[in-house]
C-alpha cells in the first residue's frame, strides 16, 4: 500500500509538471501568434494608408524655333527679236531665333548673236537682317557724343562723391574706436546664456531619446486602430481561457490521484 501511495504521489508530481510545461508552451505560442497577427495587421493597414505615387517621366517637348524655306523657280522669256533670257533664282530663307535671310539669284541672258550674259550677286548684294522681339533704336553720332559726355560728367561726380565718402568715414571712425571694447564686453555676458540653453536642449533631447517601454498592442489601441487592438486582445483572452481550462484539468486530475491513493 505504501508503495502504491508513493508511486501515485510521484505520478501526480510528474503529471503536474508535464501539464505546466505544456500550458506554458501553449500559452506562449498563443501569445506569439497574437503578437504576430497584430504586427501583420498593422503593417497591412499602413500599406493601405500609404498612397503609391508613380514617378511620371518628364515629357521632352522639343520645339523648333526656326523655319527654313527654300524656293527655286526658273523663268525663260523670248522676245520677237529672237533673244531669249533665262533666269534661275535660288532663294534660301532660314528663320531662327534671330531670323536671318539670305537670297541668291543668278540670271543668264542669251541672244541670237551667241552672246551670253550671266549675273551673279556677290555677298555684298545679299542682305542679311536680324530681327528681335525688343528692337533697339540706332544711336547716332550726336547721341553717342552726348552719352560719352554724360558718362564723363558722372564719372567726375562719382570720384568727388567717393572722396567725400572717404573723408566722412575717416571722421566717423575716430570716435567709434573706443566704443568697440564696450560692445565686446556687452556681448560676453550673453555667452553663458547660450551655453545654458544649448545644454538644456541637449538634456531635453537625451530624455526624449530614451526608448519607451510600450508594447505594440498599447500603441495600436492609443492610435485608434480598434480592429487590431480588438484582435490582439481577443487572442490573448482565448489563450488565458485555455490556460485556465488547463489549470482546471490539472486540479481535477490531482484530486482524482489523491483520492485513489488515499482510499486504496
From Swiss-Prot:
Pfam families in UniProt: MSA_2
Q: Which UniProt keywords apply?
A: Cell membrane, Disulfide bond, Glycoprotein, GPI-anchor, Lipoprotein, Malaria, Membrane, Merozoite, Repeat, Signal
Q: Where are the sequence repeats?
A: 60-91, 92-123
Q: Is the keyword Electron transport in the record?
A: no
The UniProt entry's GO biological process terms, in alphabetical order, are: cell adhesion
Lipidated positions (GPI-anchor amidated asparagine) are 238
Q: Which residues are glycosylated?
A: 22, 36, 152, 168, 213, 237-238
Polymorphic region: region residues: 44-190
Highest taxon above the source species? Eukaryota
Main location per the UniProt record: membrane
**GO cellular component: a single term:** plasma membrane
Q: Where in the cell is it found?
A: Cell membrane
InterPro entries assigned: MSA2
Region forming the signal peptide:
1-20
UniProt remark on domains: The N-terminal region appears to be involved in lipid binding.
Described by its record, this protein's role is as follows:
May play a role in the merozoite attachment to the erythrocyte.
Q: What else is known?
A: Same sequence in Indian isolates FIS1 and FIJ4.
Q: What is this protein called?
A: Merozoite surface protein 2
